[in-house]
Amino acid sequence: MIISLSQLSVGYTLSHPVISDINLELRSGQLACLIGENGIGKSTLLKTLTGFLPKLKGSLLLGNRDIESFSQRELARQVSIVLTQKPDVQNLTIEEIIGLGRSPYTGFFGRLRAEDRKVVDDAIATMGIEKLRGRMIQTLSDGERQKVMIAKALAQETPIILLDEPTAFLDFPSKAETFQSLQRMAHERDKLILLSTHDLELAVRFADSLLEVKKGTLQAVSATDVKASIRAIIDR
């Protein structure tokens, strides 16, 4: 799967786009990291790429199709997303939450078949949350909840996975483990995983490509550039 962006502008009003003139191509089989200051538009871009927000201008293609040509169900089979907001659900077990990731493939009543349950089991194992399987979502810590929502995205089995600061609530060892798992998944399962992050050192270590939002633009940057930025911050 390929995401192709041409002359793309994203935001809330055409007169004041958050990011404009985006020209970029991202291919499956890679972990791409989106970096930049708080409030600069990373979440807005991710929401546009998944169809939550309409594009303001330009072209946004998934494969060879414009994103606006997909039905909601079709799009849910192409792109999954994990946002930073807490899920507005309670009284569901972790296994049930992750099972909701199968909804694009289940029938009207949403019953999971044997093959769906295998996918759910695989997502739970991949994120290392077997011990949480029977817990209720409202009993989890922020970090545990984030792992569950990533597992739900994995269970959705989309070629494109978008993650908005997926390691924000994790301790450092868990952050590194999550980055490593996502990189391995992108490579071994031929997925395009795009995540926003402030963990620059981990982004440099694990990302196949680095994208920086700065002053209303999106540009590919090198690991050397990011390391220089880290040094500049430390030396202030």
Predicted segments with their positions:
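H-loop/switch region of ABC-family ATPase nucleotide-binding domains
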Residues: 197-198
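Helix-to-loop junction immediately C-terminal to a conserved catalytic motif
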Residues: 50
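Conserved ABC transporter NBD signature motif
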Residues: 58-66, 75
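The feature captures the beta-strand-to-loop junction immediately N-terminal to the Walker
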Residues: 35-37
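Catalytic Walker B motif of ABC-type/P-loop ATPase nucleotide-binding domains
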Residues: 161-164
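A short, flexible loop at the N-terminus of ABC-type nucleotide-binding domains that lies
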Residues: 1-5, 9-21, 89
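Conserved ABC ATPase signature
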Residues: 136-140
